[in-house]
Amino acid sequence: MAKGILGTKLGMTQIFNESGEVVPVTVVSVEGNVVLQLKTMEVDGYEAVQLGFGDIKEGRQNKPQKGHAAKASATPKRFIKEIRTSVTDFEIGQEIKADTFAAGEMVDVTGTSKGKGFAGAIKRHNQSRGPMAHGSRYHRRPGSMGPVAPNRVFKGKLLPGRMGGEQVTVQNLEIVKVDVERGLLLVKGAIPGARKSQVVVKTAVKGN
């Protein structure tokens, strides 16, 4: 069965495994996940669990948010996502904890990549640069815009522009350790996003 939990990326560190090897890990805080709503086949046409994470300041809460959260006896949440899974094991208002996952499980982590601002074609699309010699008039430019005949540049041309700030999913990461008391997941390797950014940890589609 697919599982999922919402969390905050706290940063990276390293731990030693049983064989004494250093393992780089990302620490994800998952404390405070609450089931806000259950989507069922009869009502919605599909099954999913709606999770809420991270409280909204009282002065910024509106009536729809308060009413939706009140059905789960919870406070309004900043971060709300649906996890497509069977709803039989869940109840509205139930708290989802770090022990949803166990050490050794493979997960997919989705987050928003760091924004890099306006970037050129070389940095943004990993293109090669031209010769840097004095006679060359082509160094870090995008190159040909395409044939003359269409009288336009085709959509999808790899050009400079805003880089980063996009939804990114890293697949098949191993959960190295689960700290239930502190509500932490230690995921092997790097995950998308800056520190304190929101992430979704779900059962790996291709793993396990």
From Swiss-Prot:
It comes from the Bacteria. One of its GO terms (biological process) is translation. Pfam families: Ribosomal_L3. Disulfide bonds: none annotated. Gene3D superfamilies: 3.30.160.810, Translation factors. Keywords: Ribonucleoprotein, Ribosomal protein, RNA-binding, rRNA-binding. Residues 126-150 are annotated as: Disordered. GO terms for molecular function: rRNA binding; structural constituent of ribosome. SUPFAM superfamilies: Translation proteins (SSF50447). One of its GO terms (cellular component) is cytosolic large ribosomal subunit. Part of the 50S ribosomal subunit. Forms a cluster with proteins L14 and L19. Belongs to the universal ribosomal protein uL3 family. One of the primary rRNA binding proteins, it binds directly near the 3'-end of the 23S rRNA, where it nucleates assembly of the 50S subunit. This is Large ribosomal subunit protein uL3. The lineage of its organism: Bacteria, Bacillati, Bacillota, Bacilli, Bacillales.
